[in-house]
Amino acid sequence: MKIMVQIFKETLLTSLILFLMTACSDDKKELKIIVEPTSFHFEQTGGSKKFGITPNEPATFQSSEAWCKVTSESSTPVQAIYNITVEPNTTPDVRNAIITVSVKEHVQEINVEQAAYIQSDEPEKYTVRENLTTHQLINEMGLGINLGNTLDAVGDWIDPSNILNYEQAWGSPIITQEIIEGYAKAGYSSLRIPVSWGNLLSDDFKVHPDLMDRVEKILNWTLDCGMVAIINIHHENEWIKQVPTDSKAKEKFTSIWKQICERFEKYGDHLLFEPMNEIGYDEIWTPWSGSEADKAKALGYVNDLNQLFVDIVRNSGGNNAKRHLLVEIYNTNLEYAYDPLFKMPNDPANRLALTVHYYTPANFAILGGGEVVDWGVGRESWGTEADFKELNDNMDLLKKNCVDKGIPVIIGEYCADSRNRTKEVIRLFCVSVTEAIYSRGMCPMLWDTPGGQYNRQTCQFDDPLFLEEMMAIPVKYPRN
């Protein structure tokens, strides 16, 4: 009996060892494959959207429908990026496709849904969706970029005989349809178009018709690419600051915005208005000088400007009654977004978002490397543990105090001065800031100018890795 028990124990032990060895062997062979996102919704017009496979392993794809196809986009040793391209839906029914992804032993299905074709006499760029919230629109805006130093160029030395002289004054070529299409082809979903409307403004505050025509032409190129556009008043702070206290300045502000509203009243959800740019009252209050009463006065003036802007737009005609609008915080500095003295305007349409600019740390984002000014010296690099902590802490504050409380946020400008810095450190900063913004449900809009990241001569990005890393962010953080 003892011998049988001993044999049983030895047999059991041997089986257990073999099982564990097999399990360990299987664990070593097991490769975790991640395919994301696994569901997509396309509008009736079709288009392309990206998904990723991590790690980068050979994959095969089978689509259940001929109108839905997969093509390779880009790859790194860590991740492969693919495009799902969907043809326009010409049927009156919602349609669905299943893409079967096979990577070694791993099989994953991606579900694709496309909206039905609805006969309409109204082009999409004129459409207002009644139930579209501003937060949902922010999601649609994806990654954004600025057409900077172009329609916003100013200077009394500029020849006023042709409006295009202003457009080229700060180094930009004349904007073409191909330049605008290049942003969309690169993957950007929204374009901010800063405009200095004071160029050639008449004494009775009438916008020059050539400027109005030019803005509308560039706007139409933008909308026809499927992008969302933002138009503002830029570089006119000296007189705009006087609006709360000077009747003539208020008349000028009101006149310009009424003309903008009238000209663009037919455009729909894909056009947003922004009242001004980086307005502050340093002569009244700064964080380093002035009393709490002075601060309340300075921030109150910006509140007044926002409310005046909303009132003008809402009381104008056409689609402006339900247009999604941006409002600004003091100096567009992040910390004033959640300052108790900042007040969101009253808006009967409830279609407002905050716009914030992010140039932190200032001695990297604003100054060139080694540049010396009275308040500091420009850093040549960025990317320490402390740098990332500062970035994430700032974006966490915005999310906690605004996004999580139902206030949508756009980071309307961010970038870094490239002087005396490598493209690698500029790329690291811009991509890191973009990811920190996007991952928290906000819309990042890179400040880009002639000679910046996007080459307006070739209509491509000079640093392909910059674009590749940027476009991997929406794949990493899919939105509904």
Each model region followed by its residue ranges:
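Bacterial Sec-dependent N-terminal signal peptides
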Residues: M21-H41, H106-K125
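Solvent-exposed, low-complexity, repeat-rich "mucin-like" stalks and linkers
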Residues: I34-Q62
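Surface-exposed binding patches on compact interaction domains or structured appendages
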Residues: G52-N83
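A short beta-strand micro-motif common to beta-rich folds, especially ectodomain repeats
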Residues: Y82, D93-E105
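N-terminal carbohydrate-binding accessory modules
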Residues: I118-S190
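An active-site-proximal structural segment forming one wall of the substrate-binding cleft
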Residues: Y126-T127, W170-L191, L201, F205-H234, ...
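Active-site region of glycoside hydrolase catalytic domains
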Residues: E251-D387, D396-A416, S439-M442
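Substrate-binding cleft of secreted/luminal carbohydrate-active enzymes
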Residues: E385-D463
